[in-house]
Amino acid sequence: MSKNTKYVFVTGGVVSSLGKGITAASLGRLLKNRGLSVSIQKFDPYLNIDPGTMSPYQHGEVFVTDDGAETDLDLGHYERFIDENLTQNSNVTSGRVYWSVISKERKGEYLGGTVQVIPHITNAIKDRVHRVGKERDVDVVITEIGGTIGDIESLPFLEAIRQIKYDVGKENVCFIHVTLVPYLGKAGELKTKPTQHSVKELRSIGIQPDIIVCRSEKELSEDIKKKIGLFCNIDASEVIQNLDAEHLYAVPLMLHKEGLDRLVCEKLGLGCRDIDNAEWIDMVHRITHLTHTTKIALVGKYVELHDAYISVVEALNHGGLSNDTNVEIEWINAEDVTKENVDELLSGVDGVLVPGGFGDRGVEGKIEAIRWARENKKPFLGICLGMQCAVIEYARNVLGLEGAHSSELNPETPFPVIDLMPEQKDVEDLGGTMRLGLYPCKLEDNTFCKDVYASDLIYERHRHRYEFNNEYRTQLIESGLTIAGTSPDGRLVECVEVKDHPWFVAVQYHPELKSRPNRPHPLFVGFVGAALNNK
């Protein structure tokens, strides 16, 4: 390794969902603003190989990387904050670690030795930490450990990072512990005892946190910080408060004000420039001072859990920022949409978005919403299954193919306008077997897509098995559907549009996965702009 890579490990205590991922992403942004190169990864303690086959209700969105890895939604936060494309090495599960070790044992690679958690599992974990640093040759690798201190599942990861401190030298490792300082309204007090016990548990397995980041709804007084420092064996200046923020992108500035990035640089001996947060400060200012407002209906099947569509939501906000517009999302459960009530449900919106998903639940409601948007000239954006539903709707209601459907959702359909990709027909396993990752797409002239991308060839991330059926291509084109983008060989349809409509675009890929606050995705910029003009 040409650089003396430093390692920051972020753990969490007391309760889950404290924002370890946002803390890690925010630190990455701050270190980049100091001129350092950074990569981030997450270790998840569950035994699934990856989250690709998990229900969104269990895990939220599955975030797909350029190299086709199906990963934790926190990788989306990482990419959006540090503006770097991550890889499969940035998300590792217990399942993947155990699988790799057991596979080696079956091949006889351990020479008949007894395979144990220590050293075999812990060494495999350590290898994956170092792999990220080697892959990018970065100054700092930030690793988030999923789960909560005290969970049995996390112990091998914690033991591995404890060992890394001694493998690479304590001057090259910084431990950050994110914890909760709850406020009891009746007593009018902040309580530090949960933090004390969490750190005690962490220290009992050999890890002394260097910095404690305290989530709280109330400001921590200097006395509270001193108390936490006293019982947790750190200086009060190393206790950082992280108050609830108005929006995610304000968190890096809040943590910088508390001195988090300065402390990390000091502890790791990082010679870095003074921080330049000017661009980020300007972006946060613009987010909080938007001039216009537009309302977008998001019609999906997992709308009860907004994390299932978190990248779509963020991409809409990025598109709004580019248009100086606050995007209000109207969450519509696709199962509730019928031909009888669609006008009532959608009449107050300026645009309709149908995101990706799997399975037939709610599909007819999505198709109704798409019909309404097409017939009422409302800006529409369809993503993945949203594009497939748009093709089905057009085939049924414009081309007149009654019963047209996807062979995935109705194997008996007389008109399978969406069908299984030929290379998928003999695939039996579900995990990691779809068309995944970054693929090129050739755009056609005189289309919405060509206008917003301003490019002939684009690269987008995919996650699907089913595709536009070319047997119906000529019929659909002749009836007015525009094929706006295809694979370079012209075989796979990637983008479709409707003529004589202010904005009707549907794409097979997932544009939301490449949108960044400082570089909003052009499709979302165009869609939000069209919705704003439609008011």
Curated annotation (Swiss-Prot):
Binding annotation for Mg(2+): D74, E144
Main function: Catalyzes the ATP-dependent amination of UTP to CTP with either L-glutamine or ammonia as the source of nitrogen. Regulates intracellular CTP levels through interactions with the four ribonucleotide triphosphates.
Reactions listed under catalytic activity: UTP + L-glutamine + ATP + H2O = CTP + L-glutamate + ADP + phosphate + 2 H(+); L-glutamine + H2O = L-glutamate + NH4(+); UTP + NH4(+) + ATP = CTP + ADP + phosphate + 2 H(+)
Annotated family: Belongs to the CTP synthase family.
UniProt-annotated stretches for the region Amidoligase domain: 1-270
Transmembrane segments annotated in the record for this chain: none
Binding site for CTP: S16, D151, I152, E153, K191, T192, K193, P194, T195, Q196, K227
Domain of life (superkingdom): Bacteria
GO biological process: 'de novo' CTP biosynthetic process; pyrimidine nucleobase biosynthetic process
Listed InterPro entries: Class_I_gatase-like, CTP_synthase, CTP_synthase_N, GATASE, GATase1_CTP_Synthase, P-loop_NTPase
Thylakoid in keyword set: no
Record domain Glutamine amidotransferase type-1: where: 295-535
Underlying gene: pyrG
Gene Ontology MF terms: ATP binding; CTP synthase activity; glutaminase activity; identical protein binding; metal ion binding
Source organism per UniProt: Clostridium perfringens (strain 13 / Type A)
Quaternary organization: Homotetramer.
Binding sites annotated in the UniProt record for UTP: S16, K191, T192, K193, P194, T195, Q196, K227
Location of the active site: C384 (nucleophile), H510, E512
Listed pathway(s): Pyrimidine metabolism; CTP biosynthesis via de novo pathway; CTP from UDP: step 2/2
Gene Ontology cellular component terms for the protein in this record: cytosol
Stated name of the protein: CTP synthase
Binding site for ATP: S17, L18, G19, K20, G21, I22, D74
Organism lineage: Bacteria, Bacillati, Bacillota, Clostridia, Eubacteriales
Additional observations: CTPSs have evolved a hybrid strategy for distinguishing between UTP and CTP. The overlapping regions of the product feedback inhibitory and substrate sites recognize a common feature in both compounds, the triphosphate moiety. To differentiate isosteric substrate and product pyrimidine rings, an additional pocket far from the expected kinase/ligase catalytic site, specifically recognizes the cytosine and ribose portions of the product inhibitor.
A Pfam family per the record: CTP_synth_N
EC category: ligase
Residues involved in L-glutamine binding: Y57, G357, L385, G386, M387, Q388, E408, R465
